[in-house]
Every structure is written in structure tokens, then in C-alpha cells.
């Protein structure tokens, strides 16, 4: 019965170039060591035992391979740490019927109290969506689709805003043919108003930690869900309301807990290792960056994008500004709902927020550096 369905083999992340084989037959490849991908293995599996082989290559000396905070040397040094190669996130199988939901995007509107769902569907069928809050039904929508892009809008009977430090999530059930999905969304928007960062029209001061996502035992891999949640809870207990997810694309389980807790985060890319003085550096970031935006679009806790960190001119070689501008423009084209910082801290090219990295350790001196800034 299972073999009559479409079978997808999912990988949370494999660093860096992955080739997947089923029973000795090549069935898929993926480039990029940080984002999730799936392979349709339906034609390759057989009844009974199957052998899955993954060949991973991770040459971080290649100027087009993004390594983030992974050390180029055998040992950790300065602000780079132990390397990771191969499978470092969860692997699982998904069985789907012939008519199914491939992916969805949620567009909540806090003014109208409306949720618009844009789904990519396979096959013809009826698309039905139903939302709940604290167990109470809060709205539904039903449309027929020929497949492809399917749009449905739910007028919400109750308006519960997602809040920083609190969360507040709606449960969402999606049906398409025989396919059933349980999901969630948060009712929130983001807007810049001069020097103010507004979440649901309330100015929010971001007191963030720099989370680099390394663990003593698993290096890049968290030992369990408790470890992911503990990082968030410890940070909040110390008075922080969020984090820069620094030089690493975090696994979605972490973002799930951020959504629950109301813990705001910035999504980054592990751009260290890319040589930005060459025009072809774009090939080392753009495909995987687009995959990251598409994957994490629905997380309300994710409040902004930052594809590059601390880029600058090196020696006689100037950073290729057009690459930074292109990545910024691509980001805004895919996701106009969030701000984007082109390169955090240094040589900005085109950005929504002009941020500065100041490593002054003396509080009085730090305050003096910015005493002329407008106060809100």
C-alpha cells in the first residue's frame, strides 16, 4: 500500500555537496550544507529492505563553499570552531497520496483579521483550511483547485496577536484530497517607522544574544529538543527577548520553539568562507539563501533577514558590491514582509537597517559613542 504513494526522503541538512543513492541507484543531489531538501525516491524503492547511501563532500577551502563559523584548521581557533561534514540533521521518510500539498505560505493581516494561504498543490481536488485558537474554531475556507498555486483566505472570528515574550499561535488544519496537514501561524506584522522597529504596531527594543548554534557533544547537532528549548529559556531568563542566529541556518525545531515562546530572531546565512571579491561568489550563496527564505517564511518569530556578516574590502581587493545588492533585492522580492540587512556591521551596500558592530566594552564609552542618536 505504501509503495503506491509518492515517497520523499527528507534531509534536515547535509554539509555540503550531497549525492543520494537508493539500492545503488543515484536518485538525487543537493548543494548547500545548511538547508533542508527532499528527494523523490518513489521509482527506486522496493518492498522489504532498501539501502540508502549518502555521499557528502565538504571542501571548505573552496572559495564558493560557505562554512560559517567552522574552522579551516583541524582545531578550533579564535572565533571559528570544530568542523561538521555530512548529515547533521534529522532524516525521515514522507508518504503522500497522488493529490497532496507540496508547500504553503501564510500571509496574516492584523488589521482585517484575515489569513491568506498560498499553497502549491499537486493534482485536482478540494482545498479546505480550518483554524483554531485555544481549541476554539476561528474560521475556515474551502476552494477547489486544478493543482498548482491555490489561494484561500480565512476571515478570523477572533483576533489574537502574536506577542514578543508570549507567543500566541493559531492551530491550522489543511486538507487536500487525502492529504492532511496540521500546522500553525501567528497573527503579526512588522514595519519600520523611522528609527522604530514595530511588531504589531508596537515599538520593540531588541535585546538580543548572538547564538552561534554549537554544542559540546554534537557540535552543530543539538542532542535533543530539550537542548534547543533550554537555549531559548536561559536567554529569556537573563532578560533577552531574542537572538541573532549567527553564521548558521538553524534547524526548524528551534524556530518552532521560538514561535511558541515569542522569542524573536534574525535569520542569517553562514557566508564566512565565501570570497566576495569575485562576481561568481553569488553562486555560493544565492541558491541556498533562497531555499532558506522559502523554508522559514511562515515562522512569526523570525523578524528579519541578514545574508552577510561583516564584509569588507581586503587588501587590494574590493568586495563585489553588486553581489550584496543582488542578494538584498532577491530577498525583498521573495519576502516583502520583513526587513533585510544586507551585511551586518560593516560595508553596507543596500539595506533596510544601517547597523554597526561596536566592540567597546566600557558602558560609559559605548553610551558616549551614540549620545547624538534620536531617542524614542
Regions found by a protein language model. Give the residues of each.
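Beta-strand-rich binding/interaction modules
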Residues: 22, 113-144, 150-154, 172
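Accessory beta-strand-rich segments of carbohydrate-active enzymes
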Residues: 1-100, 123-126, 249-252, 261-266, ...
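Substrate-binding/catalytic cleft of secreted carbohydrate-active enzymes
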Residues: 230-233, 242-376
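N-terminal carbohydrate-binding accessory modules
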Residues: 104-106, 172-235, 341
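Surface beta-strand/loop "capping" patches
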Residues: 95-124
Amino acid at each position: 500500500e505504501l509503495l503506491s504513494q509518492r515517497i520523499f526522503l527528507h534531509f534536515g541538512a547535509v554539509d555540503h555537496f550531497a549525492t543520494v543513492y537508493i539500492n545503488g541507484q543515484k536518485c538525487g543531489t543537493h548543494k548547500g550544507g545548511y538547508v533542508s531538501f527532499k528527494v523523490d525516491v518513489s521509482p527506486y524503492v522496493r518492498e522489504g529492505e532498501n539501502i540508502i547511501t549518502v555521499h557528502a563532500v565538504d571542501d571548505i577551502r573552496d572559495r564558493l563553499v560557505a562554512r560559517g563559523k567552522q574552522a579551516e584548521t583541524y582545531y578550533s581557533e579564535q572565533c571559528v570552531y570544530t568542523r561538521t561534514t555530512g548529515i547533521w540533521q534529522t532524516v525521515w521518510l514522507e508518504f503522500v497520496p497522488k493529490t497532496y500539498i507540496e508547500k504553503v505560505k501564510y500571509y496574516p493581516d492584523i488589521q482585517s483579521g484575515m489569513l491568506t494561504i498560498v499553497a502549491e498543490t499537486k493534482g485536482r481536488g478540494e482545498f479546505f483550511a480550518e483554524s483554531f485558537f485555544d481549541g476554539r474554531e476561528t474560521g475556515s475556507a474551502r476552494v477547489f483547485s486544478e493543482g498548482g498555486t491555490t489561494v484561500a483566505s480565512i476571515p478570523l472570528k477572533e483576533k489574537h496577536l502574536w506577542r514578543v515574550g508570549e507567543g500566541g499561535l493559531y492551530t491550522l488544519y489543511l486538507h487536500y484530497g487525502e492529504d492532511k496537514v496540521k500546522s500553525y501561524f501567528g497573527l503579526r506584522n512588522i514595519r519600520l517607522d523611522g528609527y522604530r522597529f514595530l511588531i504589531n504596531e508596537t515599538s520593540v527594543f531588541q535585546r538580543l544574544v548572538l547564538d552561534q548554534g554549537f554544542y559540546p557533544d554534537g557540535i552543530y547537532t543539538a542532542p535533543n529538543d530539550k537542548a534547543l528549548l533550554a537555549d531559548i529559556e536561559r536567554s529569556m531568563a537573563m532578560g533577552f527577548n531574542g537572538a541573532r542566529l549567527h553564521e548558521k541556518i538553524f534547524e526548524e525545531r528551534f524556530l518552532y520553539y521560538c514561535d511558541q515562546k515569542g522569542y524573536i530572531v534574525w535569520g542569517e546565512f553562514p557566508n564566512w568562507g565565501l570570497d566576495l571579491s569575485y562576481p561568481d561568489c553569488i553562486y555560493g550563496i544565492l541558491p541556498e539563501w533562497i531555499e532558506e527564505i522559502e523554508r522559514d517564511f511562515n515562522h512569526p518569530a523570525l523578524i528579519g533577514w541578514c545574508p552577510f556578516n561583516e564584509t569588507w574590502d581586503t587588501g587590494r581587493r574590493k568586495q563585489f558590491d553588486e553581489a550584496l545588492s543582488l542578494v538584498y533585492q532577491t530577498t525583498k522580492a521573495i519576502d516583502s514582509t520583513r526587513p533585510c540587512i544586507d551585511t551586518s556591521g560593516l560595508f553596507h551596500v543596500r539595506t533596510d537597517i544601517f547597523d554597526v558592530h561596536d566592540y567597546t566594552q566600557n558602558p560609559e564609552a559605548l553610551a558616549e559613542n551614540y549620545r547624538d542618536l534620536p531617542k524614542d
